[in-house]
Amino acid sequence: MSLADLIRQIPVLEAAGGSTTSLPVSMISSDSRDVLPGALFIAVRGYSADGHRFIKSAVERGAAAVLCEEIPPVLPDASLPYLRVEDARQALALAARQFYGFASDALHVIGVTGTNGKTTTARLITAMLNACGIRTGYIGTNLCTFGEQQIPLDRTTPEAHILHALFRRMLDSGCSVAVMEVSSHALVLQRVYGITFHAAVFTNLSMEHLDFHKTMQEYAGAKRQLFEQLSPQGFAVINSDDPRAEEMVSKINPEKRFCCTLDQTGRVAGDASRRFSAELIDQSIASATIRLCFPDAQQTISTVLPGQYNVMNLLQAAAVGCGMGLGSPVVAAALDALPGVAGRMERIMDRRRKEFVFVDYAHTPDALFKALSTLNALKSPASRLIVVFGCGGNRDRLKRPEMGRIAVENADLVILTSDNPRDEDPEMIIDEIEKGIRVKNHKRITDRAQAIRTAVALLQPGDVLLVAGKGHEQYQETAGEKSFFSDQETLRNALAEENAGEPEKGAVCKGC
């Protein structure tokens, strides 16, 4: 594609250097390290680094043109075109959309946003639609999937040029729908700018990312942007029990709202023909039976996902299915057949043991409280609930003491450990968690593997262990370096060590 075609929809304020008339562009990048000969390098001001500092590096690696907010006073190569725009992030999104042939316009894009539940809800929607014969791709926390393809990602919502490249690959593989998690960072940083969503889902809003957004009002405003990009023909699915629900969809036509409620009322007005509710009929530590109340019928399903919050996740997936034109019996049958979601209340099975061991991604105060409350309600009164968790480095520090308080108030034993300390001292992170702890039912073991092994060694028959924070993640990030780490693998090895044998072969469950 020529540079002239690529920037056709981008207002260029100033140009310097060479001509743009027929210059071919082979790729788009905002990371100078990824630049190959013929690339358009777009200098974006990032959260921790400014792309303008790397223009020279991009040119040295073969960039054919540079798009930026400030043209360098001395051009690294005056034969190349340098184009100044007002907003490089918007330009990146528009250029990527053009470069990849407007693939997002040809897909039904479903966006899922909220503090907790994004991954579970998005993965449930994806699996449900695929089970119903609708070829659907998924983009979310550290992973993109479509068909047999699995592509690792480094964030929940990729940068715009990566995102549109994935849309193109999905479309070329035969997908008609793309389900994606949309983070508040992605909305503020305009990674999804220019994308029209066929459906938008709001799960909930609670304390998180206040290092970035500063206030809850600012955080809510970021989430609301998703609904401002909803197609006029699209629909919104909302957790109407959440206090922020009305705020999210205040500008959406009530006829385009699908309201999901567990308390049978909800906080958002909506027509009964678009109201969904659910009732948890029965649950054990291994499964649950749920009655889904569609506008036109009631359907009963079973699931390996425990807890009221997972009832809402399933209900919202059901509402999306109906919004896509699927009948309630078809939706219910698809949801009933689904396995669990990796790292979301994932049970680690060892049939030689009589304890219950779970891995969950809970890394916010609200998510940790809900996970612990769910397991407390399901365990026997004589059994103990043990939790192993930590807080991420270089992230919201305000939540650390709150998570410490929640843990000790809702578990019999708490083991504080490391969870991606990044550039922070892991001992100092644990110190901050301990500020919220007023009782002494906790230990601190900085080494996460040792913390997990200690927890397993302390288990008695009937006890419940929750290892929280990482979920599906397969790494530990320390001092800027990522190394392989799996809570699941560490737990299986620890259980095998306690059994004085090897991990049991074939010990799996529907949700593993």
Swiss-Prot record:
Cellular compartments annotated: Cytoplasm
Any one Gene Ontology BP term:
cell wall organization
The UniProt record gives the binding positions of UDP-N-acetyl-alpha-D-muramoyl-L-alanyl-D-glutamate as: 32, 156-157, 183, 191
State the GO CC annotations: cytoplasm
Instruction: Look up the record and name the cofactor or cofactors this protein needs.
Output: Mg(2+)
Provide this UniProt record's keywords sorted from A to Z: ATP-binding, Cell cycle, Cell division, Cell shape, Cell wall biogenesis/degradation, Cytoplasm, Ligase, Magnesium, Nucleotide-binding, Peptidoglycan synthesis
Establish whether keyword Transcription regulation is in the entry.
no
* Annotated EC: 6.3.2.13
Stated role: Catalyzes the addition of meso-diaminopimelic acid to the nucleotide precursor UDP-N-acetylmuramoyl-L-alanyl-D-glutamate (UMAG) in the biosynthesis of bacterial cell-wall peptidoglycan.
The protein's name is: UDP-N-acetylmuramoyl-L-alanyl-D-glutamate--2,6-diaminopimelate ligase
- State which gene encodes it: murE
